[in-house]
Amino acid sequence: MGTPEFPDLGKHCSVDYCKQIDFLPFTCDRCLQVYCLDHRSYMKHDCPKGNRGDVTVVICPLCAKGVRLNPDEDPNITWEKHVNTDCDPSNYEKAVKKKKCPVPRCRELLTFSNTIKCRDCSIDHCLKHRFGPDHSCSGPKKPESSFSFMGFLSTNTKEAPASSSSSSRWSSLFASAEASISRLGNDISQKLQFASGNDGNSEKTQERNGKQNCGKVTVDVCPKCSRGFRDPVDLLKHIDKDHRGTSKA
């Protein structure tokens, strides 16, 4: 096998009746045996593990689900496991029964190409009954309005209570509503008074600061005799007259 220069070059085919030496042999990924070019496929060398990669799925007639058969397991055992654990006969109608147009006396099957959802009622219909008048569209669902205090007052002023118990209940609700409104008004008035008081205090503080600033007087001191002068001109005259024009100590 091989050549004098490369003695390990090439291998014999693993098929008994072949044994051909191949310098570029093929190794089977299932049985891990070496084969020549002619016997490299699973069918050519009758690979015992060639069907491990095959996927076989059987549709269950009871639930319409796909059951995958394991190559290393008996199909009967796989089927029994599915029947005992996974099988749900109620799913058969959902999977097999095809959707139809909901309009009475219309037997049109709804598929991907002929199905249109109504914008108002959000229900699928066929092309023939895609418009609202054709399928007696009920229109969009009205959203439930949230409880509002004004609506509560308006409805209760128009409609009288039917019994004494209901009237007492409505009166208690009215009383609590009036109390909450009066409490809210008091809070608002207190906040307004507090804000106006703060504004007055701030104005008084500004006036006081202005008066203090106006009362301050700047005095220039003579560096020679430490005499103070309010007017800088008087300070210069004093230096020229009394200190002969010298301000340095």
Curated annotation (Swiss-Prot):
It holds the Pfam family zf-C2H2_ZFAND2. A zinc finger (C2H2-type) spans 220-243. SUPFAM superfamilies: AN1-like Zinc finger. Zn(2+) 4 binds at C118, C121, H135, C137. GO terms for molecular function: transcription cis-regulatory region binding; zinc ion binding. InterPro entries: AN1-like_Znf (IPR035896), Znf_AN1 (IPR000058), Znf_C2H2_type (IPR013087). Keywords: Metal-binding, Repeat, Zinc, Zinc-finger. GO terms for biological process: response to abscisic acid; response to salt stress; stress response to metal ion. One of its GO terms (cellular component) is cytoplasm. Zn(2+) 2 binds at C28, C31, H45, C47. A zinc finger (AN1-type) spans 7-55, 95-145. Zn(2+) 1 binds at C13, C18, C36, H39. PROSITE patterns: ZF_AN1, ZINC_FINGER_C2H2_1, ZINC_FINGER_C2H2_2. The keyword Zinc-finger applies. It comes from the Eukaryota. Transmembrane segments: none annotated. May be involved in environmental stress response. This is Zinc finger AN1 and C2H2 domain-containing stress-associated protein 13. It comes from Arabidopsis thaliana (Mouse-ear cress).
